[in-house]
Amino acid sequence: MPVKVMIPSPLRPYAGKRDSAEFNARTVGEALGRLTSEFAELRKHLYTEEGKLRSFINVYVNDEDIRYLAKENTPTKDGDTISIIPSIAGGLPSIARGGI
């Protein structure tokens, strides 16, 4: 069952500069495992040392957030798209930029 894993721009340097990869996988966890096996540098950006998906990494299957499904055990089927969306934080408060 090939599923497509979309790799976001900030993580592409750790995935051979690819924007996506396809794998045969029955679950989200299996697909992410195959992704990090192929691109070992990517693993530390997606997972903690304990092997848990990092809290700022959001994963979707066909626009459905896996946190509200079966998490990494969420089943996948042929043609599904898995999107990895890292949360972005930072910037300055408006007062620091001269605003109010």
Summary of predicted features, one role per range:
Residues 1-100:
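Ubiquitin-like/PB1-type beta-grasp interaction modules and other compact soluble beta-rich domains
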